[in-house]
């Protein structure tokens, strides 16, 4: 199950159960590659190798099974559920409603912000005053109430009145099986952390990688900073830390060739958050597992220096315990 790099598609789609990466990471990456859409079945569907021309992909969908439709394109193969509803807010903005891509019909940048805000507020109905604040962040230089009315009308025309509902207060309605990347990532992180606690390393590995793949991409990157966006971005930054931590722990638990993945994830965690003490502990364990005990001890010294200089604290008990064990091995 070794993943050499997060961007290597073959490893991403071929080495995990359908219910995790297939539902989020594979779909996101597939959309990056020549607009291919990979529709996947329920969690318990068996894997079936299906080579995509020109890309070496291995997908895990049963091509002949309903409700899949096979479409041969010049750029590859399209496997799509006819009723698929998917919203991607991290990285490239994608909205697919019942198998139709509709984000190109959105009225403006504000239309994307409006839809994203309502999606993340589901199922709550949002008042117009709150929507004005979410879109324009206190900029009342123009008649924002009228502008919001026009924006809602155009967005409703793009997605349908059954999706964008309400008048005085507005809310988005998506099917029960709709997939929203942000929600899937946070749910996957919860599963990963739970699996780590229980020592279920394979389950933790796939869930953590799913969360990691989404949270590594910026939320609505083409939009100016807004207070609510800043809050969500910080939340997803924290989730990325958690996903990298859970992934490294899962790789350590699996052992073998996965140890290299643990080291890479721990290093990425420390690059993203140098004050994350668990990152130092995971990196020390990964290096020691690969026989690099001396380097692991150097990591401890680095942790001690960073924590002292930045926070004025010594390493905590967990990392100190790892250090003590390594000293015994090194001696």
Q: Where are the predicted features?
A:
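Short acidic, hydrophobic short linear motifs in intrinsically disordered regions
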Residues: 125-133
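C-terminal flanking helix
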Residues: 152, 156-160, 304
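Hydrophobic, low-acid, alpha-helix-prone terminal segments
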Residues: 2-12, 18, 29-32, 45
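Conserved RecA-like P-loop NTPase ATPase core
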Residues: 95, 115, 131, 155, ...
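Polybasic, low-complexity intrinsically disordered segments
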Residues: 23-70
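Short boundary/linker motifs that mark transitions into or out of structured domains
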Residues: 52, 56-109, 162-172
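Conserved catalytic core of two-component sensor histidine kinases
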Residues: 149
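Intrinsically disordered, charged and Pro/Gly-enriched terminal/linker segments
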Residues: 81, 103-110, 116-124, 136-146, ...
């Amino acid at each position: 199950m070794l993943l050499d790099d997060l961007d290597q598609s073959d490893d991403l789609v071929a080495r995990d159960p359908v219910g995790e990466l297939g539902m989020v990471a594979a779909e996101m990456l597939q959309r990056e590659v020549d607009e291919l859409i990979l529709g996947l079945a329920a969690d318990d569907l068996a894997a079936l190798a299906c080579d995509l021309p020109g890309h070496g992909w291995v997908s895990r969908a049963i091509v002949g099974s309903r409700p899949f439709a096979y479409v041969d394109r010049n750029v590859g193969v399209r496997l799509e559920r006819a009723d698929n509803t998917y919203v991607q807010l991290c990285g490239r903005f994608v909205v697919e409603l019942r198998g139709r891509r509709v984000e190109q019909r959105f009225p403006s940048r504000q239309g994307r912000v409006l839809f994203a805000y309502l999606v993340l507020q589901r199922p709550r109905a949002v008042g117009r005053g709150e929507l004005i604040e979410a879109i324009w962040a206190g900029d009342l230089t123009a008649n924002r109430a009228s502008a919001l009315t026009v924006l809602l009308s155009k967005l409703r025309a793009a997605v349908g009145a059954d999706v964008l509902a309400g008048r005085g207060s507005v809310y988005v309605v998506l099917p029960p099986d709709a997939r929203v990347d942000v929600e899937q990532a946070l749910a996957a992180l919860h599963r990963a952390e739970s699996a780590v606690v229980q020592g279920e390393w394979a389950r933790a590995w796939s869930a953590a990688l799913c969360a990691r793949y989404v949270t590594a991409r910026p939320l609505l990157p083409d939009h100016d900073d807004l207070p609510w966006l800043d809050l969500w971005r910080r939340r997803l930054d924290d989730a990325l830390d958690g996903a990298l931590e859970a992934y490294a722990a899962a790789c350590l638990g699996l052992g073998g060739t996965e140890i290299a993945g643990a080291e890479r994830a721990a290093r990425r965690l420390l690059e993203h958050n140098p004050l994350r003490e668990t990152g130092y502990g995971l990196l020390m364990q990964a290096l020691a597992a690969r026989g690099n005990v001396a380097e692991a001890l150097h990591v401890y010294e680095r942790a001690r220096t960073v924590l002292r200089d930045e926070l004025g604290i010594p390493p905590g008990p967990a990392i100190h315990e790892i250090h003590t064990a390594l000293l015994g091995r090194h001696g």
